[in-house]
């Protein structure tokens, strides 16, 4: 994935130097967590039920696009349980020994959070099966015919796994999670609440209409909303009086090249290439990526999900196709035969 993607203000991934700010804005409890009401209610029941029984909760799998709060929920789960949180990621667990060391250091009721759990190496995943199910691991000592397996007990713990690609998890791993929850994109009104909370923490004077303006350009993602808020704050402090009004927000987002729908330069380049260079498609993602000078994974994993959700691009067996909404967005007349959307637009029912 290209570095340009990581520098985009509308990227749902954490950018360089953003981690500390991101942590400061994280909610500390389910009560503080805004959005995802169904998931919050379900987690509240799981947590309170386990606390009432004095037991360790079932293992929890959180899935959904990046930037929606999966890591925040893992931290909240540990805090609500009064437990310690140990954090790692799938790519960091390359060998079974890496996982064995982490598991051996757990104490009873600890919460182990594995981000990007779909990327865990197979040897570590197979060790995780036994740890999740029986709270033990088998450590192989020696090599060849003389190797022996030594069982080691693991303190009862709760695994919280996070994934942006639930379909990439193996069946045996997925089946070992007692509770699974999918997190959806946020509604603009929910993002307004996220922005108001962040503004209070950061000491930013944010008008209600300005918050609504930023929210509707945030692609349904709290992390993007908080990032755009900081960009607008910079603009307001340098070119205005520090107060963020709707007009200030609109002027700032124009400077940062984020339009009314939350699309940026790369999104518009993809739509422009799809319509102008390929007549609206269908066209393969690799060919489309070459046309905009990006890697295919960037187009497929970064731009496309939002463009599909916004109703501007449709996936077909023959390739990507621009919908009538994409042509309208570009102020172009769609070819004869191009109809409406193959899926609802963003925030539409």
Swiss-Prot record:
Q: For binding DNA, which residues are annotated in this chain's numbering?
A: 315, 320
Q: Which UniProt keywords apply?
A: ATP-binding, Cytoplasm, DNA damage, DNA recombination, DNA repair, DNA-binding, Hydrolase, Nucleotide-binding
Region Large ATPase domain (RuvB-L), residue ranges: 1-186
Q: Where is this region: Head domain (RuvB-H)?
A: 260-349
Q: Which InterPro entries match?
A: AAA+_ATPase, AAA_lid_4, DNA_helicase_Holl-junc_RuvB, P-loop_NTPase, RuvB-like_N, RuvB_C, WH-like_DNA-bd_sf, WH_DNA-bd_sf
What EC numbers are recorded for this enzyme? Answer: 3.6.4.-
Give the superkingdom in one word. Answer: Bacteria
Listed binding positions for Mg(2+) are 71
- Positions that bind ATP: 25-26, 67, 70-72, 133-135, 176, 186, 223
Molecular function terms from GO: ATP binding; ATP hydrolysis activity; four-way junction DNA binding; four-way junction helicase activity
Cell compartments where the protein resides: Cytoplasm
- Which catalysed reactions does the entry list for this protein? ATP + H2O = ADP + phosphate + H(+)
One GO cellular component term, please give it: cytoplasm
State the top-level EC class. Answer: hydrolase
> What is the similarity comment for this entry?
Belongs to the RuvB family.
Description of how the protein assembles with itself and partners: Homohexamer. Forms an RuvA(8)-RuvB(12)-Holliday junction (HJ) complex. HJ DNA is sandwiched between 2 RuvA tetramers; dsDNA enters through RuvA and exits via RuvB. An RuvB hexamer assembles on each DNA strand where it exits the tetramer. Each RuvB hexamer is contacted by two RuvA subunits (via domain III) on 2 adjacent RuvB subunits; this complex drives branch migration. In the full resolvosome a probable DNA-RuvA(4)-RuvB(12)-RuvC(2) complex forms which resolves the HJ.
What domain notes does the record hold?
Has 3 domains, the large (RuvB-L) and small ATPase (RuvB-S) domains and the C-terminal head (RuvB-H) domain. The head domain binds DNA, while the ATPase domains jointly bind ATP, ADP or are empty depending on the state of the subunit in the translocation cycle. During a single DNA translocation step the structure of each domain remains the same, but their relative positions change.
Stated role: The RuvA-RuvB-RuvC complex processes Holliday junction (HJ) DNA during genetic recombination and DNA repair, while the RuvA-RuvB complex plays an important role in the rescue of blocked DNA replication forks via replication fork reversal (RFR). RuvA specifically binds to HJ cruciform DNA, conferring on it an open structure. The RuvB hexamer acts as an ATP-dependent pump, pulling dsDNA into and through the RuvAB complex. RuvB forms 2 homohexamers on either side of HJ DNA bound by 1 or 2 RuvA tetramers; 4 subunits per hexamer contact DNA at a time.
Its protein name is Holliday junction branch migration complex subunit RuvB
Write the gene name: ruvB
């Amino acid at each position: 994935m290209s570095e340009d993607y990581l520098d985009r203000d509308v990227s749902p991934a954490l950018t360089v130097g953003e981690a500390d700010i991101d942590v400061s804005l994280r909610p500390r409890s389910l009560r503080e967590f805004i959005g995802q009401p169904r998931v919050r209610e379900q987690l509240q029941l799981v947590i309170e039920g386990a606390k009432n029984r004095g037991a360790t909760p079932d293992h929890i799998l959180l899935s959904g696009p990046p930037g929606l709060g999966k890591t925040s929920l893992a931290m909240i789960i540990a805090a609500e349980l009064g437990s310690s949180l140990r954090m790692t990621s799938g790519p960091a667990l390359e060998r079974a020994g890496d996982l064995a060391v982490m598991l051996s250091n757990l104490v009873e009721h600890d919460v182990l959070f594995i981000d990007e759990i779909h990327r865990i190496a197979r040897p570590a995943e197979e060790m995780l099966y036994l740890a999740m199910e029986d709270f033990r691991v088998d450590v192989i000592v020696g090599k060849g015919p003389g190797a022996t397996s030594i069982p080691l007990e693991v303190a009862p713990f709760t695994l919280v796994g996070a994934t942006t690609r639930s379909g990439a998890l193996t069946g045996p791993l997925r089946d070992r999670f007692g509770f699974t929850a999918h997190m959806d994109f946020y509604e603009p009104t929910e993002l307004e609440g996220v922005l108001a909370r962040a503004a209070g923490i950061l000491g930013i004077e944010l008008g209600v209409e300005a918050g609504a303006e930023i929210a509707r350009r945030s692609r349904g993602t709290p992390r993007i909303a908080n990032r755009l808020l900081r960009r607008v704050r910079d603009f307001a402090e340098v070119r205005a009086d520090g107060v963020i009004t709707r007009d200030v927000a609109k002027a700032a987002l124009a400077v940062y090249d984020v339009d009314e729908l939350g699309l940026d330069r790369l999104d518009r380049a993809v739509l422009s290439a799809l319509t102008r260079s390929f007549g609206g498609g269908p066209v393969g993602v690799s060919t489309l990526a070459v046309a905009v000078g990006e890697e295919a994974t960037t187009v497929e994993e970064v731009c496309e999900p939002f463009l599909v959700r916004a109703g501007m691009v449709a996936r077909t067996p023959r390739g990507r196709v621009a919908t009538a909404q994409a042509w309208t967005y570009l102020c172009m007349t769609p070819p004869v035969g191009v109809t409406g959307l193959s899926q609802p637009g963003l925030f539409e029912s």
